[in-house]
Amino acid sequence: MIELEYSDVFNKTIEKLQFSKNLIKHPYNEKSLFAILVDGKSMEPLINDRAIVVADLSNKTLKNDGIYLVYYNNKMWIKRYNIEKDTFFSINPAFSHLIYKKEEIHIVAKVLLTFTNL
């Protein structure tokens, strides 16, 4: 089992997330894993608003269609990578204007898992 803490910025609490190691299908560094609560709809329907994502700070290798946590303009964003255009973009058509060139951003981590509260 893996247990991670994350900050619920909506309720101003620290929460715990427990999940089986078997859920992660990609190589990862357990000491570099962290969880973050999503605030936004730009990656819906793949990642819902207020979902919890697990990301690996040690994994910044870009792969086509990979989902990454990136830093741009003093904010953190979750975006999909397009290797042909060398850009990061939102998958929700309502946010299609959110496109960032690789040289404009800092790659923070690769998103490995998403948990959605139903």
Ranges and model annotations:
Residues 1-49, 59-61, 115-118:
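Short, positionally conserved secondary-structure boundary motifs
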Residues 35-37, 54, 69:
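Short aromatic/hydrophobic contact patches that present stacked aromatics
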Residues 47, 74-77, 103-106:
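Short coil-to-beta-strand transition motifs
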Residues 51-52, 66:
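Structural motif
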Residues 60, 74-76, 95:
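Short Gly/Pro-enriched loop/turn and capping motifs at secondary-structure junctions
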Residues 65-77, 82-86:
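Short, compositionally biased
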Residues 83-118:
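Glycine- and charge-enriched low-complexity intrinsically disordered segments
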